[in-house]
């Protein structure tokens, strides 16, 4: 995972697998970035994600709900064919 914050926009680049084990850690880390930066725009790039189970979907929905509560917007970029 990589992240970048610039001018109100927080971008998270996720990689490899979004399974239960990975999501447990990612949830804490990503929420920390969201609370720290309070972005107006939150971008998650999935271009390097090869596998996503229901935990990954839950991760995305949970971050969406948090961002929506903050009156910000969330953008999901580049979902690969295998996870669409």
Please place each PLM-identified region on the residue numbering.
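Amphipathic alpha-helical interaction surfaces in cytosolic regulatory modules
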Residues: 20-84
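STAS-typified acidic loop motif
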Residues: 1-28
């Amino acid at each position: 995972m990589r992240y970048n914050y610039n001018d109100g926009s927080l971008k998270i680049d996720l990689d490899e697998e979004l399974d239960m084990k990975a999501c447990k850690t990612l949830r804490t880390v990503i929420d920390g970035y969201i609370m720290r930066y309070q972005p107006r725009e939150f971008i998650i790039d999935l271009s390097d994600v090869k596998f996503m189970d229901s935990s990954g979907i839950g991760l995305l929905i949970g971050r969406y709900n948090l961002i929506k509560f903050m009156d910000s917007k969330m953008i999901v970029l580049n979902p690969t064919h295998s996870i669409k």
